[in-house]
A protein has these predicted regions:
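Cleavable N-terminal export/targeting peptides
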Residues: 1-23
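Outer-membrane beta-barrel domain signature
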Residues: 24-25, 34-35, 52-53, 59-60, 98-103, 111, 140-146, ...
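Gram-negative (and chloroplast) outer-membrane scaffold detector with strong preference
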Residues: 42-122, 126, 158-159
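A residue-level signal for beta-strand positions that form part of recognition/binding surfaces
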Residues: 25, 87, 154
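Short N-terminal segments immediately surrounding and downstream of signal-peptide cleavage
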Residues: 23-39
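Predominantly the C-terminal beta-signal and adjacent terminal strand-loop region
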Residues: 119-161
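Short hydrophobic/aromatic segments of transmembrane alpha-helices and their interfaces
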Residues: 3-4, 30, 149
Length: 161
């Protein structure tokens, strides 16, 4: 009986440690179309964000960013129950846009955001994800700068687990 109790106690401590060290989030970003987002923490201050993008509902793409998470001052009154963070990140993205005459795009993606993690498993965020890179249609190639201003801001809603 004593060995069983010790085993259960060790498993409980390890599972709590893993849950704290590896939080995850899944949800959507609404803005320039819709992004289905999965976030995986890499410690307290870093995370990987993987997204499937549906820009203006006229194509499909994917992005992956490595983000640095920075908490706001914890002494401020609005941090009483939840937690405010801001983040910066960089990554890559690619996709196809348009149906009648589709073109492809690929390039570097940036990420700037502010998020609020509630005391229950919900996160709200405001993000800007500019991208710049190459684009092509048929045999023509070009430089995509539209992603710097066209993608705009988005509102994110995620479930934390």
């Amino acid at each position: 009986m004593k060995k069983s109790f010790i085993l259960v106690a060790i498993l409980a401590v390890v599972s709590v440690g893993v849950a704290v060290a590896q939080p995850r989030a899944i949800g959507v970003n609404l803005g320039y179309g819709i992004d289905l987002s999965y976030q995986h923490s890499l410690g307290e201050a870093n995370m990987i964000d993987l997204s499937v993008n549906i820009p203006e509902f006229h194509g499909i793409g994917a992005t992956a960013t490595y983000d640095w998470i920075n908490p706001f001052n914890t002494a401020i009154p609005w941090n009483e129950k939840g937690e405010w963070n801001w983040s910066l990140g960089v990554g890559a993205g690619a996709g196809i846009y348009g149906f009648k005459q589709p073109f492809w795009y690929a390039g570097v993606v940036g990420h700037v955001g502010v998020e609020y993690n509630f005391w229950f498993p919900l996160q709200l965020s405001v993000d800007w994800r500019p991208n710049i890179g190459l684009t092509g249609i048929d045999d023509a190639f070009g430089f995509n700068t539209g992603g710097l201003y066209r993608t705009g801001f988005s509102l994110g809603v995620r479930y934390l687990f």
